[in-house]
Amino acid sequence: MKAFRFLPLFACFLFIVGCTSSTTEIKTGPGPGETWRAVHFLGYETDRELRELEKTIPKLAEMGVNTVIFEIDYNFNFNSHPELRRGASPITQKGSHRFAETCRKNGIRIIPEFQCVGHQSWEEETFPLLVEFPHFDLTPGAFPDNTGIYCREWDVLNPQVNSMIFELMDELIEAFNADAFHVGMDEVFLLGSEHSPSTKGKDPGELYAKAINDMYNHLVKGRGVEMLMWGDRLFDGKNFEFGRWESSLNGTASAIDMIPKDIIICPWHYEKMKAYPSLPIFIEKGFRVLPTSWRKVDATKELILYSQKLKNPKMLGHLFTSWGKTDWLKYQPLEEGLKLLLDK
C-alpha cells in the first residue's frame, strides 16, 4: 500500500519533466542576438499548394532557415468577411494551422503578411476589397481597367477600411498562431494624388505615417505582436540614385520620423551596389533592420556582406525573396546567401 501512495507524486514528476522537455526541445525562430535567416513565400493560394510547400520545410530548416514570412493577402478563407476571399479554394484555417505547426516543429518562426494600402490590384485584376467596396478606393473612378496605374490603393482616411482590415489581420494571427505580422506597405504612390478626393493636396508623409500608426496601434499595442514592413517608402531617394521603386520620390519618406521605432523595417535592394545607405539610415533612426534581396546571387551576397560590415545589433540578418513559386531547395541566392550568414 505504501508504494501506491507515491504513485501520484511520481506521476506528477513525470508530467512536469515531460512538459519541460517538450517545451525546450525545439527552439522556434532566432533567439536574442541570433541572425535571422528568413525566406518570403508568395503564390501559394490553396491548401494543396501549401501542403506541397510544407514538404520543403524540414530541408529548409536543415539548410539554416529559421524564419518564414508567408504573404497570404486575400487568399484565405476569411470568416469575418467571406466576401473578401480570393479564388475558389483559398487557404483554410486547418491548412494554415498545419503549415504553422510544421514550421514550429522544425524550429522556424512563421510570420503572416497582408499587403496593406498599396498592391490592391495587379495588372487588370482588382483585388476583393476594392471590388466589393469601391468607395474604399483611394482614387475612385480613376484609371479604368487599371490602365495608367501601377497598383490600386485603399483610402487611408476612411475609418471603415481599418475596422475591416484589422478583422482580417486578427484571423490570420489566430490561424498561424503568430507573434509577428508583416503589413507590406511597399510601392505606395498615390497618396496626395490629384485623383484622390480624400487626400488631394495633403502631405503624403503624414498620410503614410497615419496608416502605419493605425496598424501599429492595432497590432503591437492591441494584439501584442511584432510589426514588420517594407522600407522603400521610408527611404528618401532624393539624394541617392536608387530610383522611385527602391526609394521614395513622392514625399512619403518624412514618415520615418513620425512612426514608432520598434517596427522592424525590411529595406529591399535587388542590384549590386557599392553601398546601401538605407541600412545605416534606418539603424541611426533606431529601427531594427532586415535587408531583403531577390534573384541575383552577386547582389544578394553584396547586400549581406555590406550589412555584416555594419556590425550593429539592430541588423537582424537577411530576408530572401523569389516573388513567386520556386524550388527553394535549389534557389541559388538562398544557397549562397546562407553560406555567408552561417559562416559567422
Question: What are the residue ranges of the model-derived segments?
Answer:
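Glycine-rich, aromatic-flanked loop segments that form ligand/cofactor-binding clefts
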Residues: 34-37, 59-72, 100-142
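Substrate-binding cleft of secreted/luminal carbohydrate-active enzymes
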Residues: 290-344
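The substrate-binding groove and active-site-proximal loops of carbohydrate-active enzymes
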Residues: 38-48, 81-93, 146-163, 197-207, ...
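Aromatic-lined carbohydrate-binding/catalytic grooves of carbohydrate-active enzymes
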Residues: 61-95
